[in-house]
Amino acid sequence: MELNRRQFLQAAGAAAATAAVAGMASTAVADEAEVMTAEKADATKWSFEIAPDPIPEDQISQVIEHDFVIVGAGMAGVCTAVAAAEEGCDVIVVTASSTAISRGGSNHAIGSKYQIEKGIDYNPEVARKIVKAEQTAGTYFMDKKKWARWINHSAESINWTIDLMEGKGLKCCLEPGFPDPDGIIDVPPASHNFYTDEQPFGALWGAPIEARTYAQILTEDLGCEIHYNTIAKQLVREDNNTGRVSAVIAQDSDGNYIKYVANKAIVLATGDFSRDRDMMRRYSPVAYEWFKDQLDFETLNYDIELAYNGLMPGDGQKMGLWIGAAWQKTYPVAPMINGGASGPAHGVISNFWGLNMDIHGERYMNEVTNFSYGAMAKLMLPEQTAYSVWDVNYAYTQDSWERFGCCIDLENGIMPSTPEEIIASWDKSAEAGESAGIAATSVYWKADTIEELVEKMTGIDKEKALETIKKYNEYAKNGLDEEFHVNPEVLYPIENGPFYATKSKGATFLTVCGGLRTNDKMQVCDENDQPIPGLYNTGIMTGDFYANSYNFVMPGQNLGAVCGTLSYLLGKDLAQL
């Protein structure tokens, strides 16, 4: 519509008058249609909740029938498939990826034969304290029955995995534990990873090797098929979405629709939903706000493994919702985040235990925690920015410095650093002006005096920082931290040059842990907590296993529990159907 000059002036005058009235009226609100209310929110559907039209039967080019159809060839999917096939089950795996995939490598286990061999006293009774600490951290919102199944069958499942992997030439090692000086989140060596001579870094790259080995066992030894590059699109639930889930329709790389009929059950193991913007906004809103500029909601790569900008689009979760599955009860879905204040870490999953400051030059917490809790604290800071300060003597606060990838007996050849080597690494980083980690980079400084160091530290209140360092040194000399009460055993003064500092911003996003409502037998349930006949899920999309955050207090819990033990048990349970 076009306006002449007179109409334009009339409209402008009316708008000005309206604005004036609105400005004077303290209760004035925007147009009612723009105001969200609880009633409107309840009546609104998210994009992912709206089911697509059913794929017509005449578009289906092939029907393939098996007793069990497992959707997804990540760690959980192939573990479930092998466990079921070993029991004689007729299994097929359908996956969007071009190979079996996974990421990381740490499998937390309780009471394995490998731990017993190494003299590590860790069994369900010993683990009671750390389990209670973890469940308390999750405010008891998680499903404790799932936890009990994991804890009580952890040794059984990891021993099974060790035997399978070693049978194919892989080696197992144990990563160091986390020695909390306060004994609150103290955990012994419990993270098992698998490595080869060609790839000794099992803590970071062991999971892909493990998943591909499961796939090899499934196809070569057990005679089952994996259909790669085949994306599941819809579940088929009988009786107008009130009966049994009997099939899944998938699309192959040529665009053909294939109907996979499951005579007994379908298992969803499709990973997380961190590449779906709406699902992140709806189910993990805090993580969404923190990382929305980092996450990639446009690109889809079903072969993705180690990445920090999102993983999967939530295919399995959506398909479940479309046929009547309920969402998990725990809210929000727990994000997996790490990357605390940077600096020399007493263990690879430690926050920097020395002096941490914010942009105001002030301390903000008891620094002695792990790198996940350290990251959470950093994300709450102004500009999400933390500074760390220490002196050269800090290198001698322990005899050796664990490197990421080390095993407790150094079997894989990755050696810890000596104090002299760690100092050399600080000098190298300071010379470069930065320290590049696995997923993030920190600004690095070095100076001969504290005053010179602080002068180099950009973005911080320098005067306040000097006061804070002075006060911290007094606490260290007196053996009493009067602010945050750091354990005096790890309270070290900053007094002998050269001096070092880092500046780190934000945190590292890995994934989100949760999805469809799932009981302890891994059955997908409806809003009334009733199992949906014929439908299971497993892996990271398992609902209600985690709460608040995945905090790495039991490092390797995700691969060890939902992708390992619970998937193993599901495979064995399927054989009883």
Model regions and ranges:
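Glycine-rich FAD pyrophosphate-binding loop
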Residues: 86-103
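Extreme N-terminal leader/targeting segments of oxidoreductases
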Residues: 2, 7-67
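N-terminal glycine-rich dinucleotide-binding loop that anchors FAD/FMN and/or NAD(P) in oxidoreductases
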Residues: 105-132
